[in-house]
């Protein structure tokens, strides 16, 4: 009888353990889905901004510039566009990261971010990577040089540490960082 009671307690404990793990797995799946949706949306808006706004207004003499707020004939650079949109969100973080960014503030913040970014740059078939990193769930999506002006700006910027970009290259990544506890 004791053996059966012990076995029953063991089975019950295992079931409780699995029940406790299911919400965690579901939460991770929800975070992954949310990260992918956010990244795909930001990628689409950024691409539309570059292809349909930046390239169009150039014809009228308006250009993207770092100091665009001081110039009536300038608009934000595509990276500034993403960062400005991300600055208006309080529940999670959207930004850009790169292995050779013009600004050091755009370097990856953790080793896991660096590794994900390296995978994006070496495996062109991978477009989005999601992962758990400590108390955060993160996703990165390749940020491509979609037009020649992206390449020219990065290759000619005085603070650029990398000057060999070509159209279509992975220049870095769009990143989303979400707290796993929902706060």
Where are these regions (language model features)?
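Acidic/proline-rich low-complexity IDRs
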Residues: 2, 15-17, 116-119
């Amino acid at each position: 009888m004791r053996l059966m009671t012990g076995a029953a307690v063991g089975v019950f404990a295992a079931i409780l353990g699995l029940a406790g793990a299911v919400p965690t797995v579901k939460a991770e799946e929800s975070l992954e889905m949310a990260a992918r949706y956010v990244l795909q949306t930001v990628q689409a808006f950024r691409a539309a901004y570059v292809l349909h706004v930046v390239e169009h207004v150039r014809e009228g003499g308006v250009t993207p510039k770092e100091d665009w707020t001081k110039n009536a004939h300038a608009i934000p650079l595509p990276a500034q566009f993403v960062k400005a949109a991300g600055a208006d969100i309080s529940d999670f973080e959207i930004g850009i990261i790169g292995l050779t960014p013009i600004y050091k503030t755009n370097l990856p913040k953790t080793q896991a971010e660096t590794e994900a970014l390296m995978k994006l740059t070496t495996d062109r078939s991978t477009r989005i990577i999601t992962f758990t990193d400590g108390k955060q769930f993160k996703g990165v999506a390749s940020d491509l040089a979609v037009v020649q002006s992206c390449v020219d700006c990065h290759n000619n910027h005085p603070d650029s540490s990398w000057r060999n970009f070509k159209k279509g290259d992975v220049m870095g990544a769009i990143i989303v960082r979400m707290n796993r506890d929902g706060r």
